Amino acid sequence: ILYHWRVHENSTAASSGSKTYTVQSGKKALEAHLSRMNIKGKVYEAEFAPNFFKIEYDLFKTPLVSIVIANKDHKEDLKRCLDSLKKSSYKNYEIIIVENNSSDNEIFEYYSEITKDGNIRVVNWRETGFNYSSINNLGVRESKGEYIILLNNDTEVINDNWIEELLSIAQFDNVGIVGAKLYYPDDTIQHAGVVIGMLGI
């Protein structure tokens, strides 16, 4: 297939600024689609480029969300993670920390401190070695929430509405799992999702 891209000074192919009405037209088209599908949400123009849009879906309900965090030692990492969670605008959540073979007394003292908060529990994975799947499965079994978030202990939440963002997609019947964009400390992207359905995966 030979494809030619025609660039004209009065065309959006050269610059979106030449036809600014296309932004509003795109926004209205998405709003009309939501209305036809009987889905409640707001359409916003993306900040990074013109004629790109973000849909913020309304939550159907506010279910309990269980946040499972596997942890071994590393008090400072865990503390940073938990401190960032406190900034979350979504409040109906519980935290299950799966302790796996820590040897530093400092972390156990920290556990005693944080479990005074009613929505934080520590459960013990008592097997030897390291099995990340088994550790997380224990946390899931101990969870009471309708939705589960698997979170690394060295993660720091940077957007206070992060739980709402995940829920707004996960709540649809045709969605089984939702991933988040992760950044390194220097703001480069560490992870931006996994594509499934290719090569039989």
Question: Predicted segment positions?
Answer:
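Glycine-rich, basic loop-to-helix element that forms the pyrophosphate-binding segment
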Residues: 125-143
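Cell-envelope/extracellular polymer assembly enzymes that use nucleotide-activated donors
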Residues: 63-68, 94
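Short, acidic, metal-binding catalytic loop of nucleotide-sugar glycosyltransferases
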Residues: 83-92
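Short aromatic/hydrophobic "clamp" motif used to bind/position activated sugar donors
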Residues: 148
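Conserved donor NDP-sugar-binding/catalytic core segment of glycosyltransferases
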Residues: 156-200
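A conserved acidic beta->alpha catalytic loop
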Residues: 99-110
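Catalytic core of nucleotide-sugar-dependent glycosyltransferases
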Residues: 16-41
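Short beta-strand/loop segment that forms part of the nucleotide-sugar
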Residues: 92-101, 123-125
